[in-house]
């Protein structure tokens, strides 16, 4: 059975398009023995692009997140796709929003963490094999990626860069209140929409 990693639906009244990112971010899906290749991941940037292109300009996207993170390159691409979209993007953390998933949240116009949720920010890491020269080269590449990530987070953060870097060095778990104080989200909790009364 194919695992559904991202779910998309349209809420008819109000033209709100809901996307549920409820898995690790990955370029590749499951291995397909029939095609002898990987299926497209539903949490990849390529799949996300298709979802965003289907949303008319000016309408609203609700991006619900419950993810431990995943591929930095895919997550960064998703962040930029959100930035480019002319829809109004509301990011809502429903559970956990760790690592690159928290970067994706930063691409939304409005960033919300639900009550009892958590986020984690940390330095990038990678599993690498090779000789000493190759390992040093990979470390240099990580430094470049890390610098880009810090600058991305600083676009809206209200703390200074030194404090953000210290928090990432310490692999900090953020409560909604702490994230709000740091300017990394805009709001805690989602307001319940009133249902229209029927006489």
Question: What is the predicted function of each stretch?
Answer:
Residues 1-102, 107-199:
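N-terminal organellar transit peptides
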């Amino acid at each position: 059975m194919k695992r559904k990693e991202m779910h998309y639906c349209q809420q008819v009244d109000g033209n709100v398009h809901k996307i549920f990112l409820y898995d690790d971010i990955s370029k590749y899906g499951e291995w397909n023995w029939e095609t002898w290749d990987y299926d497209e991941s539903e949490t990849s940037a390529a799949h996300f692009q298709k979802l965003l292109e289907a949303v008319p300009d000016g309408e609203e996207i609700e991006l619900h997140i419950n993810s431990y993170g995943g591929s930095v390159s895919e997550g960064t691409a998703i962040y930029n796709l959100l930035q480019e979209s002319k829809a109004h993007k509301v990011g809502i953390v429903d559970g956990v929003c760790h690592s690159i998933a928290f970067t994706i949240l930063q691409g939304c116009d409005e960033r919300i963490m639900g009550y009892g949720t958590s986020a984690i920010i940390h330095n990038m890491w990678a599993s690498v094999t090779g000789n000493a020269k190759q390992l040093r080269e990979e470390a240099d590449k990580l430094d470049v990626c890390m610098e880009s990530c810090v600058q991305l987070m600083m676009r809206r953060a209200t703390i200074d860069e030194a404090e953000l870097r210290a928090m990432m060095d310490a692999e900090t778990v953020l409560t909604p209140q702490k994230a709000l104080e740091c300017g990394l989200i805009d709001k805690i909790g989602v307001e319940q929409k009133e249902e229209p009364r029927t006489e």
